[in-house]
């Protein structure tokens, strides 16, 4: 079976050769958009300005909305969902409550990673009716491949809210043009953008066993969302057309709030009360003037996309007009503060929904987040309780996700146990350092120590420095840790068992849909 990456590449080429069949080109043309091919990356895109470069920050010149957003509607983080739900309700969509971020209804993933996960595979295949049709949902998602970028690029998260716009319709009721127009109207009416500030990219998407064409939308270097039109599913016997055409629009809640306010970093708009609290408690100073100069180029420091990260730091420092050392010092402290805010919210969602840190599966990644946050506190000698931070998040999000506040006691108990385990691991560090004084500490050794004994590399480097030994932690350390524990079970996404003759037998009622904490039933 081909990988998602291979499926996407092949289908993108096919769609680019016949855009009128796969994209809402008639609607784009009516609005004055024209199709172009990016001079830098060769992506096909649509704009109204004649600009020959696509909307991607690497091609268009970084983030250009910071301190100068073209959005005329200024929305705070909570206000983004409220405005979105209000407009889409008027346009015939039903706003529904989020699903748990712990994906117990699926056997191919531990956590929800996109809003469409709520409905795969059985709603997408037409075997189960959706809770509403069409619908919108503010869905928390967990992904662990960008941990090293959090706090640095200004836009990366392990936990983010994907605002989903979804529909599951037979061919005779499908209107791709209508769905595209609705999201275009969000950009114009919700954010208050003019067409000349919007760039649409032709692309393809594959994931969860499904694939199809998609339209990404950008403004001033920032991708705001991506509207996918699912046409096919991947099966062991080959690609198959879906019985239902599926709309899968995923929009970054955090990015839309950030863009709307035009602040130096999205973390300031996503966790406003928590960031203010952490600054006061830690005494950390975020140089907003320097950060405002840095953030337009921060996207260049994505460790997954850069071959020589040290050279990239030098290039960015030159653009900002400061030394590499000064830039790294400033960004390091702010990145630590923002990472603690981000990791604590991710843990709040996961633990409130029944997740549990452990040494296996998805629980391993939760433990990675918690220990990284505590390690950053140790490195900067900050004393803040994670329980207190989690409570601040829950209070701020109460108007969208009241269940987080209700489940705080459960979250606090788990965090207390994990902290005790972390403190125990710290005691091992000094004895290990003593044994390693005369050894080369390779990246592989750091990974083994973290994976087998839970010893954070930052803590190891700090203890080593105290005895005159230098240990360098790789920039992509946590991505490599997560990769060690990744599962590749793509076949499960749409593969279903052979149907049995069950005529006359009453339907089974899935009780866990009504209570996600219910894990044992009789039938």
Model-derived regions: residue spans:
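N-terminal alpha-helical interaction blocks
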Residues: 2-12
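A glycine- and charged-residue-rich anion-binding loop/surface
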Residues: 11-22, 29-30, 34-35, 42, ...
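Cysteine-rich micro-motifs
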Residues: 48-62
């Amino acid at each position: 079976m081909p990988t998602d990456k291979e499926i996407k590449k092949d289908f993108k080429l096919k769609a680019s050769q016949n855009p009128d069949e796969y994209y809402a080109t008639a609607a784009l043309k009516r609005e004055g958009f024209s199709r172009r091919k990016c001079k830098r990356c060769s992506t096909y895109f649509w704009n109204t300005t004649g600009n020959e470069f696509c909307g991607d920050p690497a091609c268009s010149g970084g983030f250009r909305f910071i301190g100068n957003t073209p959005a005329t509607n200024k929305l705070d983080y909570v206000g983004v969902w409220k405005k979105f739900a209000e407009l889409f309700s008027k346009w015939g969509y039903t706003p529904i409550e989020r699903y748990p971020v712990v994906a117990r209804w699926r056997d191919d993933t531990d956590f929800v990673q996109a809003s469409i996960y709520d409905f795969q595979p059985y709603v997408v295949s037409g075997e189960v009716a959706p809770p509403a049709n069409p619908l919108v949902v503010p869905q928390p998602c967990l992904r662990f491949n960008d941990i090293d970028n959090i706090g640095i690029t200004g836009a990366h998260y392990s936990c983010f809210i994907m605002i989903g716009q979804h529909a599951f319709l037979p061919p005779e009721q499908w209107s791709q043009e209508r769905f595209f127009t609705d999201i275009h109207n969000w950009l114009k009416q919700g954010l208050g953008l003019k067409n000349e500030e919007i760039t649409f990219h032709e692309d393809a998407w594959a994931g969860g066993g499904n694939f199809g064409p998609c339209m990404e939308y950008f403004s001033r270097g920032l991708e705001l969302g991506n509207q996918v039109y699912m046409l096919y599913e991947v099966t062991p016997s080959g690609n198959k057309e879906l019985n239902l055409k599926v709309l899968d629009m995923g929009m970054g809640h955090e990015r839309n709030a950030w863009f709307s306010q035009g602040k130096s970093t999205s973390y300031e708009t996503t966790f406003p009360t928590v960031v203010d609290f952490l600054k006061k408690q830690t005494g950390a100073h975020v140089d907003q003037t320097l950060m405002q100069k840095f953030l337009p180029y921060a996207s260049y420091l994505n460790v997954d996309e850069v071959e020589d990260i040290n050279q990239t730091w030098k290039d960015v420092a030159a653009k900002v007009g400061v030394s590499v050392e000064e830039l790294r010092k400033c960004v390091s402290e702010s990145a630590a503060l923002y990472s603690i805010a981000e990791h604590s919210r991710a843990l709040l969602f996961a633990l409130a929904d029944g997740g549990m840190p452990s040494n296996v599966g998805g629980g391993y990644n939760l433990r990675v987040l918690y220990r990284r946050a505590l390690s950053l506190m140790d490195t900067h000698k900050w004393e803040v309780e994670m329980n207190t931070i989690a409570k601040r998040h829950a209070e701020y999000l109460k108007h969208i996700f009241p269940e987080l506040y209700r489940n705080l006691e459960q979250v606090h108990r788990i965090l207390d146990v994990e902290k005790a385990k972390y403190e125990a691991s710290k005691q091992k560090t000094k004895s290990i350092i003593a044994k390693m004084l005369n050894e080369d500490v390779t990246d592989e050794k750091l990974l083994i120590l973290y994976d087998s004994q839970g010893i954070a590399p930052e803590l190891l480097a700090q203890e080593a420095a105290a005895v005159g030994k230098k240990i360098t932690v790789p920039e992509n350390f946590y991505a490599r840790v997560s990769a060690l524990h990744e599962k590749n079970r793509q076949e499960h996404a749409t593969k279903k068992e052979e149907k049995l003759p069950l005529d006359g037998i009453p339907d089974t009622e899935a009780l866990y849909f009504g209570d996600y904490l219910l894990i044992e039933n009789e039938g």
